[in-house]
A protein has these predicted regions:
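Bacterial extracytoplasmic/cell-wall-associated proteins, especially those involved in peptidoglycan
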Residues: 2-210
Length: 210
């Protein structure tokens, strides 16, 4: 089979994934002629992901991770943060939570389960997200990772996931409207961050719109 290292841990359809190759096609600009078929384009995108991951396969294996686990985690890191540093710190939060058997509690995975990922989300919508949705992608209710990725992670997200920061962070909250991310080691610190950087902004926006 082509790309055995990349596709060796591809999830099966009965794992609960929506699309088998979700997250495995590298996001980039591709040139193709009018007579190009879908199969050759997919092969080009898989080839690009394989090339970008080729120098990391040994590290992934050394860390006792599978390629699917890395792509799945990187797909969350991709959307949760926008800067390289934030992504490395976010990846560290996810690893720290996984190591302590804490649910990942990512809203990105919920939005994917709802079919809303990619749509603009307001602070209010983010705060009121349905964390009880019945889905294998609900990482509020289940421990561990989703069955597969929710988007195609960029090289920045892949690098952050393979070589994360070393922190004690267990929590983070992002202001979805500004992109700023706030990290915390304890729930108490996290609650303060949520209050200061999210809830206070919600109060301001609701009072200004009344």
């Amino acid at each position: 089979a082509k790309y055995p290292q990349l596709l060796g841990t591809l999830p099966s359809k009965d794992s609960g994934v929506k699309y088998l190759l979700e997250g495995y096609l590298f996001p980039a600009t591709y040139n193709y002629g009018e007579d190009a078929d879908l199969e050759s384009l997919i092969d080009q995108m898989l080839g690009a992901m394989n090339t970008n991951l080729s120098s990391y396969y040994s590290t992934i294996e050394a860390k006792n991770l599978t390629v699917n686990e890395v792509l799945t985690l990187a797909s969350l890191v991709e959307k949760e943060g926008s800067t390289d540093q934030d992504r490395k710190d976010i990846a560290s939060v996810f690893y720290n939570r996984l190591n302590q058997a804490m649910p990942l509690q990512s809203n990105i995975a919920i939005l994917y389960a709802q079919g809303k990922l990619g749509q603009k989300t307001t602070l209010k919508e983010d705060a009121e997200i349905d964390t009880n949705i019945d889905s294998p992608f609900n990482v509020y209710k289940k421990e561990g990772l989703m069955p597969g990725p929710v988007d195609s992670p960029s090289l920045s997200a892949l690098e952050a996931t393979i070589n994360p920061s070393k922190t004690d962070y267990l929590y983070f909250v992002a202001n979805v409207e500004t992109g700023a991310v706030y990290f915390a080691n304890t729930y108490e610190e996290h609650a303060k961050n949520v209050e200061e950087h999210v809830n206070s902004k919600l109060t301001q926006s609701s009072s200004s719109s009344n």
